[in-house]
């Protein structure tokens, strides 16, 4: 008898639309793999939704606040339901970009220096000498990211806007020039290295989730030494935060710099849309999408 899997999607964060696409793709992949699937648009009555669905396993396809910051994971722990991706602590740590980087630096992984600032103060005057990146400390998918280039007279005015709904805590981080690289990790296995060439100013929300928004080159045209280093750092980051299942680590690479690779971010619930990087790397390594989501479901766990 096949397992009954509830796929959590949608949710309440600004990344809801992306999560719906990820969830639909994962639900189809799981059905193709032979599982019974129930799709849940996760809302404020998630406890009742889970009770009604009564799944054997929960596939967490949520993105952003509430879905990948440890909160939903805590609910699933309470109900004793095995779930995919990282647990409560790793999810909460990774979602807090600055705290995650404190842990990663302690593990010897190079990350750009940054400071936490109130968004209203950061909108009035530079709190770090440009160039720097200003972004919400606890959002994903490059939502609300601003690059402040050298010579800029003022910070982004949007940070002080009344329309801003991404939290008052801003991470101001040194801008690292170079090429965009990313590595997906399946438990202790780094898949490969992809170079991302966005067709916008940087790899923003539009570039990530719009067809044609970016070009993905895999394997990345880099030396074997740098590829090995990127994959090693991605696995070390995965372990340092106590992650499980699948993660994706994003890097900047500058061959002329003393430190050629900087880890920008680790994503504990990488996108699984048709344009997403992690499933693309898995397929390059010979893992079909249905096999990938089946592996994630079979490796789901609780209280880890």
From Swiss-Prot:
Major localization listed first in the record, in broad terms: cytoplasm
Organism: Maricaulis maris (strain MCS10) (Caulobacter maris)
Descriptive protein name: D-alanine--D-alanine ligase
UniProt: Mg(2+) 1 binding residues: 250, 265
Record field: transmembrane: none
Pathway(s): Cell wall biogenesis; peptidoglycan biosynthesis
Biological processes, Gene Ontology terms: cell wall organization; peptidoglycan biosynthetic process; regulation of cell shape
SUPFAM superfamilies xrefs: Glutathione synthetase ATP-binding domain-like, PreATP-grasp domain
Positions contributing to Mg(2+) 2 binding: 265, 267
């Amino acid at each position: 008898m096949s397992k009954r899997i509830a796929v959590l999607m949608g949710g309440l964060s600004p990344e809801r639309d992306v999560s719906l696409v990820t969830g639909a793709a994962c639900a189809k992949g799981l059905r193709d793999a032979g599982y019974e699937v129930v799709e849940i648009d996760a809302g404020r009555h998630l406890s009742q939704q889970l009770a009604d669905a009564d799944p054997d396993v929960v596939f967490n396809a949520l993105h952003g606040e509430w879905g990948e910051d440890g909160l939903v994971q805590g609910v699933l722990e309470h109900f004793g339901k095995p779930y995919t991706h990282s647990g409560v602590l790793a999810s909460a740590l990774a979602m807090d970009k600055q705290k995650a980087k404190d842990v990663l630096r302690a593990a010897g992984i190079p990350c750009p220096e940054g400071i936490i600032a109130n968004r209203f103060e950061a909108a009035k005057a530079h709190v770090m000498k440009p160039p720097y990146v200003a972004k919400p400390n606890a959002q994903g998918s490059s939502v609300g990211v601003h690059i402040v280039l050298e010579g800029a007279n003022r910070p982004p005015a949007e940070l002080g806007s009344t329309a801003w709904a991404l939290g008052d805590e801003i991470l101001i981080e040194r801008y690292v020039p170079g090429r965009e690289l990313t590595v997906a990790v399946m438990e202790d296995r780094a898949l490969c290295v992809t170079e991302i060439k966005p067709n916008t100013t940087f790899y923003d929300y539009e570039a990530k989730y719009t067809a044609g928004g970016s070009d993905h080159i895999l394997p990345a045209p880099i030396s074997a030494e740098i590829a090995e280093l990127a994959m090693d750092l991605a696995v070390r980051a995965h372990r340092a935060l106590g992650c499980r299942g699948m993660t994706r680590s994003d890097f900047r690479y500058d061959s002329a710099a003393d430190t050629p690779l900087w880890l920008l971010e680790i994503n504990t619930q990488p996108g699984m849309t048709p344009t997403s990087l992690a499933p693309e790397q898995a397929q390059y390594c010979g893992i079909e999408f249905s096999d990938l989501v089946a592996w994630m479901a079979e490796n789901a766990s609780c209280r880890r």
